[in-house]
From Swiss-Prot:
The keyword Endoplasmic reticulum does not apply. It comes from Shewanella sp. (strain W3-18-1). The active site is at 133 (proton donor/acceptor), 161 (schiff-base intermediate with substrate). GO terms for molecular function: 4-hydroxy-tetrahydrodipicolinate synthase activity. Homotetramer; dimer of dimers. It is found in: Cytoplasm. Pathway: Amino-acid biosynthesis; L-lysine biosynthesis via DAP pathway; (S)-tetrahydrodipicolinate from L-aspartate: step 3/4. GO terms for biological process: diaminopimelate biosynthetic process; lysine biosynthetic process via diaminopimelate. This is 4-hydroxy-tetrahydrodipicolinate synthase. The keyword DNA damage does not apply. Keywords: Amino-acid biosynthesis, Cytoplasm, Diaminopimelate biosynthesis, Lyase, Lysine biosynthesis, Schiff base. The record marks 44, 107 as: Part of a proton relay during catalysis. InterPro entries: Aldolase_TIM, DapA, DapA-like, Schiff_base-form_aldolases_AS, Schiff_base-form_aldolases_CS. Catalyzes the condensation of (S)-aspartate-beta-semialdehyde [(S)-ASA] and pyruvate to 4-hydroxy-tetrahydrodipicolinate (HTPA).
């Protein structure tokens, strides 16, 4: 399965809010050219919460089409209703994804028993590899390593994206889940340490705009070269924090637009475009990361 530098891809939109498929194709080509190891389409950064299911599936399918087998595409299949997640999973199973990424059900705060039942039911609806996704800062539920370990025996649940930023969890997850279970960081700021401690990859927001540099850092960390990984990570650290000066993906879409990667930075309500007070902060962070701003 997929290791390394994985982009949590933005979903480009036109000024009227419709999907900008021409920009989406350019983004896919950009990541292939820059050496990104895989793409996650329509996850959190791809605005999954504001795409209706039919549009969600269409964007993932088009991403797969544009990739044309040159880079693996993982489709987001999370929902806070298990039946809806199963319906989405069945639809995504038909479009050629290499895997799926399922966030823990949000808002309704399931217990560990509920999380286990949810993920087992979703996994049973497909034979495509499933990656669990823990991001309590958004979902209001924190899936503990012990709960993840209960799902290791499900044949097509192959890993977890852990986005708490708690580095101690890497060791605990590895102890409980074994060496074959994939561990992916979902926190750019701690990704280097995560990989050096035995993680397999990073599903990254910053990777949208610094893919070559981010991959170089990931490759160094995966090779165990801590000194090189640190030297490559240091110029990017200001970017990691500034990309969260407002809710993700507001800043990264604005940055991608300023780079000329997408036609406009439109984002769907209830999110709004980046406030002016953040513009200078983000331009400064981009400049320090050696990103050309247009």
């Amino acid at each position: 399965m997929i290791n390394g530098s994985i982009v949590a891809l933005i979903t480009p939109m036109n000024s009227d809010g419709s999907i900008d498929f021409a920009s989406l194709e350019r983004l896919v080509e950009f990541h292939i050219d820059q050496g990104t190891d895989a793409i996650v389409a329509v996850g959190t950064t791809g605005e999954s919460a504001t795409l209706p299911m039919s549009e969600h599936v269409t964007v993932v399918a088009q991403t797969v089409k544009f990739a044309a087998g040159r880079i693996p595409v993982i489709g987001g299949n999370g929902a806070n209703a298990t039946a809806e997640a199963i319906e989405l999973t069945k639809s995504l199973s038909k479009v050629g994804v290499a895997g799926m990424l399922g966030v823990t059900p949000y808002y309704n705060k399931p217990t560990p028993k509920g999380l286990i039942a949810h993920y087992k039911a979703v996994a049973a609806s497909t034979d495509i590899p499933q990656i669990l996704y823990n991001v309590p800062g958004r979902t209001a539920v924190d899936m503990q390593p012990e709960t993840v370990a209960e799902l290791v025996g499900v044949s097509n649940i192959i890993g977890v994206k852990e986005a708490t930023g708690d580095i101690a969890r890497v060791k605990r997850l590895r102890e409980l889940c074994g060496n074959d279970f994939k561990l992916y960081s979902g926190d750019d700021a701690t990704a280097r340490e995560f990989l050096l401690l035995g993680g397999n990859g990073v599903i990254s927001v910053a990777n949208n705009i610094v893919p070559k540099a981010f991959k170089a850092m990931c490759d160094a960390a995966l090779a165990g070269n801590a000194e090189l990984a640190l030297s490559l990570d240091t110029p990017l650290r200001g970017l990691y924090s500034t990309l969260f000066c407002e809710a993700n993906p507001i800043p990264v879409k604005w940055a991608a637009h300023r780079m000329g990667l997408i036609k406009c930075g439109h984002i769907r309500l209830p999110l709004t475009e980046l406030s002016e007070q953040c513009h200078g902060l983000l331009i400064d962070a981009m400049t320090r990361a050696q990103i050309e701003v247009k």
